[in-house]
Amino acid sequence: MPNQRPLYIPFSGPALLETPLLNKGSAFSSEERDSFNLTGLLPHNIETIEEQSLRAYHQLRSFTTDIDKHIYLRNIQDTNETLFHHLIEQHIEEVMPLIYTPTVGQACEKFSQIYRRKRGLFISYPDRHKIDDMLQNATKQKVKVIVVTDGERILGLGDQGIGGMGIPIGKLALYTACGGISPAYCLPILLDVGTNNQQLLDDPMYMGWRNQRISGDEYNEFVDLFIQAVKRRWPEVLLQFEDFAQENATPLLNRYRDQLCCFNDDIQGTAAVSVGTLIAACLNKGQKLSQQKIAFLGAGSAGCGIAEHIIRQMQREGLTEEQARKQVFMVDRYGLLTDSMTELQKFQAPLVQKESAIESWDKSQKLGLAQVVKQAKITVLFGVSGQKGLFTREVIEALCVNTEHPIVLPLSNPTSRVEATPQEVTSWSRGKAIVATGSPFPNTTFEDQSFEISQCNNSYIFPGIGLGVLAAHATGISDNMLMSASQALADISMEYEKAPGAILPPIKFIREISEKIAYAVALQAIEDKLALPVTAENLERRLKANFWLPRYHNYRRTSF
């Protein structure tokens, strides 16, 4: 059934059919076809959205490669946004990997080759004095959520230049599909500051600014011009930083998190979903997170963000900060981070181990991952290195000496960059490891047992955070709000019946999960005085009011 309240539309004829947010295609009624000058522009038969979705699904299944399926889905999105999201709703477990990870990585690499139609805003450095005009040019005027990238660190693929736009487009599709935020309120933005990817610069089809990346003061001043323009245009917007290089990600977040409601999904979203997954995994084996010894392979902004979030959770569970930091070990390509190292990043410094604390260790070999796992008695292993195959049999077998059920989280995206496949971890641990990954993987087997692999993907968290922020009218996102999101995810995970091996609920329940996380986030925003007080009843009403469903409205004709 279409929504009961009609929409009053000033567009008609081909202009209406060319407006993705309003186009209904063959579902326009006879009255609408007459009223909006559509008679003869569409086939005679009037269809329901269910019938349209069935046809679209059959067409989708006719493609043989994931990238072709991605292109097809993006074409639907750019033609009929309601149908696009109805199709996702009906087949979310099958379609999510096609619109986001892992397929979106290929789409970013081939962005200029597969480009079809404009979506979002491309704000280039040469046009930096026109940013206010560009924001006015946006086809969506009531923007509530922006996802912005500069394309420098796309997934594990590095600098993709203008191709990075695939990430904001995909992320915002998930804000709608998982968090119920209307696509009318979502705006993807690409900051085109050049690229250092010579392959792109040499590509005759590359559509971005052909220049080496700007950096330093030039870069910071450009980003500031953008942020100030956004504040003028949409002062209450939620802005998500996405896939910025680690030397820019943390400084930008720290600089602007008190100026507007913003967060960095790579740092904070990844941390929140990782800690929520880890709490749930610990509950699965009857333990607390604070009982674990945790090692990270990869000490970039994402890994360090997760580590700091873990330390805060350990403090919530009763440890002192000093005790918690002694239980977290960061390993990069140079080995274990210690206080004897120089040239550490600012965000890495608080996470080093003191040399005095490890003076009894055997240091005849480099303190790489295997040595750290053995000597620190590690029970939880995170992979955020973006490097394939670094979780070796030796490492996994050493984990199994330390604990009966080690928790192994190879989170690097896309699947081509994962530290170990779930099947490798399951086999090497003889079915004992509890595993979750950043991208989707098939079930694993050991002997006669089958294990489902949960996807520790930010899509479990950021849509709920966004919905909670909008429902509460929050002016910022605090660490406590992120902690509440993590705890809510873990608590929710205990409510659902799960297959053997699974840590998180099936993705088909993602909308229910997002609503519950949104409620927890909104309550915490009120407690942190980042939102005005509201009764529980009114908060639930706001959440329902903000939750958009892909259904057609009846249209009425009006003038501009």
Swiss-Prot record:
Protein family: Belongs to the malic enzymes family.
Subunit note: Homotetramer.
Protein name: NAD-dependent malic enzyme
GO biological process assignments: malate metabolic process
UniProt-listed HAMAP family: NAD_malic_enz (MF_01619)
Gene name tied to this protein: maeA
Record-listed a divalent metal cation binding positions: E242, D243, D266
Family annotation (PROSITE patterns): MALIC_ENZYMES
Cofactor note: Divalent metal cations. Prefers magnesium or manganese.
UniProt catalytic activity: (S)-malate + NAD(+) = pyruvate + CO2 + NADH; oxaloacetate + H(+) = pyruvate + CO2
Keywords associated with the record: Metal-binding, NAD, Oxidoreductase
Cofactor field: Mg(2+); Mn(2+)
Residues the record marks as active site: Y100 (proton donor), K171 (proton acceptor)
